[in-house]
Regions:
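Conserved N-terminal/central alpha/beta ligand/cofactor-binding core
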Residues: 70-183, 187-189, 201, 302, ...
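Glycine-rich loop(s) and the adjacent beta-strand/alpha-helix scaffold that form part
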Residues: 214, 218-283, 437
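Short beta-strand "acidic-cap" motif of Rossmann-like dinucleotide-binding folds
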Residues: 64-69
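Beta1/beta-strand and adjacent pyrophosphate-binding region of the FAD-binding site
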Residues: 36-48
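An anion/pyrophosphate-binding glycine-rich loop and adjacent beta-alpha core
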Residues: 257, 261-263, 270-376
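N-terminal secretory signal peptides and thylakoid transit peptides that target proteins
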Residues: 1-15
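Conserved beta-strand-loop-beta-strand element in the redox core of flavoprotein oxidoreductases
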Residues: 195-217
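Conserved small/polar residues in nucleotide/adenosyl-binding loops
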Residues: 444-449
Length: 449
């Protein structure tokens, strides 16, 4: 059995140190059926970026493959993601005049995770993701020119597709899947993974439930690929590890509920790093849209309701999460000038214009006017902006923002700000895997065949 989860280790703080076998109770294993309703060589669970990639590669290698999606549309979290992709691609970083390499990416990712991640997995990710960029181009993805440091990314190595969002990856992969004859079946929910015996033997296939409640057993002659994503859309599971997250919104699509992980545990797979739950600023409580002017973080600062900065905006996402959750009403405001707005709009134009139209993002010709619109003390906000602009000159920030991110003053009108709040974004743990994406069996550390 193989596991190919795009979200595992992304961001660098996933842990491979501790197993959490009691997580939400592992599902009981399915009984082996006497007959099978259908058979494929490879069955892929989930139609996000990982699932479609796995299905396409399997199909191109000659396997009779199928991708199963429990929701009514394909795409998973990739479909609703911002689309930013970190990779140390030599042509890109040399053109930008930036020092980078897959080895530096690996080193920074390990450090960003407090060295708790599995070094072999981190190296596998960082060394192979440049090839993933080229593979995406092969299947039809077009990227915008240039790279930048995305919020929480810690280094300028991110790029976005031309269409700005992760939906471009899904569109390209679906078109390619159709061309090569790979079936992607929606409203096909996997409700169990079948092994020869609960504690021994190979993985045989899956139990599938249809929209009308009917169930079938589908055999996998060669492999089952679990690419079903995490559990950030399941507040109960998240609160098991961090009660602060229970009432937060989520950036995830509703299918990210974690049941496939329980099925993996039910047949002997280990679960690791489940308490690493990443949050990002997104839609504030009581609002319908997001003021997304913080992706190009070198142009943006965060203010609390008192009008003061409270964190280094280029810090790790867990640092920003904890600092933001400690602020008044857990609501803060990204602030930028027109240069910052234009830069962020290279990636999130449509989203920001919707936010402007719907009163979630505010625009003013002076900082004082902007402060009144977002209801923070004008004199404090003006002083904060002036202090920050002075830091750009001195390259020193008491909160610890790095000099490379102290590069753009907030001086050019009009100015922009809007409320944001923390949302559950990325459950960084999952099933324990090796560098071949195989799942070891609990206690023995043999791999599931």
């Amino acid at each position: 059995m193989t596991l190919n989860r795009r979200s595992f280790l992304v961001g660098g703080a996933a842990s491979a140190a501790a197993s959490v076998s009691t997580f939400a109770h592992a599902a009981n294993p399915c009984s082996t059926p006497t007959t099978w309703d259908k058979a494929y060589d490879v069955i892929v669970i989930g139609s996000g970026g990982a699932g479609l990639s796995a299905g396409i590669v399997a199909k191109e290698k000659g396997a009779n493959a199928v991708v199963l999606e429990k929701l009514s549309i394909p795409g998973g979290n990739t479909m609703v993601s911002g689309g930013g992709l970190n990779a140390a691609v030599e042509a890109d970083y040399k053109k930008a005049g930036i020092e980078d390499s897959p080895q530096l990416h690996t080193k920074q990712t390990m450090a960003a995770g407090d060295f708790r991640a599995d070094p072999a997995l981190v190296a596998t990710l960082c060394e192979n993701v440049p090839q993933s960029v080229e593979w995406l181009k092969k299947v039809g993805v077009q990227f915008k020119p240039g790279i930048y440091q995305i919020y929480g990314g810690l280094w300028p190595r991110c790029r976005n597709p031309v269409g700005q969002s992760g939906g471009d990856y899904i569109k390209a992969c679906m078109n390619y899947a159709n061309r090569i004859g790979l079936p992607v079946l929606t409203n096909h929910k996997v409700v169990g993974i079948i092994r020869e015996k609960p504690d021994s033997g190979r993985v045989l296939g899956v139990e599938v439930e249809f929209k009308d409640g009917k169930k079938e057993f589908w055999k996998a002659n060669k492999a089952v690929v679990a690419a079903a994503g995490g559990f950030a859309a399941n507040p109960t599971m998240c609160s098991y590890f961090d009660p602060r997250l229970t009432k937060l919104n989520t950036t995830n699509q509703p299918g990210s509920t974690g049941e496939v992980l329980k099925y993996i545990q039910g047949i002997g797979g280990l679960a690791v790093g489940l308490d690493y739950i990443q949050c990002i600023p997104w839609t504030a409580p009581g609002y319908k849209h997001t003021a997304d002017i913080f992706q190009a973080i070198e142009y943006t600062i965060f203010l609390n309701k008192e009008g003061k900065r409270y964190v280094a905006e280029d810090a790790r996402r867990d640092v920003i999460r904890d600092a933001t959750l400690a602020q008044t009403d857990q609501t803060v405001f990204p602030v930028c000038d027109t240069d910052g707005f234009d830069k962020n709009n290279e990636y999130y134009n449509e989203m920001n214009h919707r936010a402007l139209e719907n009163g979630t993002l505010f625009k003013a010709d002076t900082i004082e006017e902007l402060a009144k619109l977002i209801k923070v003390p004008p004199e404090v906000m003006v002083a904060t902006i002036n202090e920050y602009n002075a830091m750009v000159d001195s390259k020193k920030d008491p909160l610890g923002r790095t000099p490379i991110m102290l590069s753009h003053k907030i001086v050019k009108a009009p100015f922009y700000a809007g409320p944001i709040g923390m949302c559950r974004h990325h459950t960084m743990g999952g099933a324990k895997i090796n560098t071949k994406a195989q799942v070891p069996v609990s206690y023995t550390h043999l791999t599931l065949p």
